[in-house]
């Protein structure tokens, strides 16, 4: 009889330990309201923006990150090939690098605009996003802010292209290419192209952080994040 009691006690204590572990991992799970959910998602997004976008603004943040590196548009790929074919590889390399430098510079100045867009999320949006897919928050931001961000981002990119000398480098490249016999003249809008790619890179890196916080418990660095994302763990 004593043996049976001891076995039951062991199981009971084991169960209590597991419950305590869950309680520590998911504190106050039952106390969440819409305001908590919205606050948690906004915290997660702001963390993602701060962490991932800061990587993009560093030197070579775009240029040496294969996930977001800005390559030449289709119209200019033939320019790149032609220049390399006549011994101007260094000029072609510089042309690619300055496009990425412009994006790195532009993202640094545009980030506060992007962060402010997070504040517009409603309670209903937050709850739907929380229980959605691994990139629901990023998709929501893309759909609700891209147009506004683009209109703000584009002039920053234009200024940045001028600041890093990309406009002059590419004016020189295009002039040399257009002077090659039997080629069709090109005149691409690099401002729009770099803006598109810079925004694409920002959203891609935010999506990386969103997936991480949804799937990696150690990425939930506050009690609020632990509580909020514990809900989606159980869906």
Residue map of PLM features:
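N-terminal Sec/ER secretory leader and immediately downstream segment
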Residues: 22-98
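C-terminal motif of bacterial Sec signal peptides marking the signal peptidase cleavage site
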Residues: 12-15
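Sec-dependent signal peptide recognition
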Residues: 2-7
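Mid-length scaffold segments of soluble, non-membrane domains
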Residues: 90-160
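A cross-kingdom marker for long, charged
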Residues: 198-235
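Bacterial signal peptide processing site
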Residues: 17-20
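An amphipathic alpha-helical core segment
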Residues: 156-199
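Residue-level signature of catalytic and energy-coupling elements of molecular machines
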Residues: 52, 122, 217
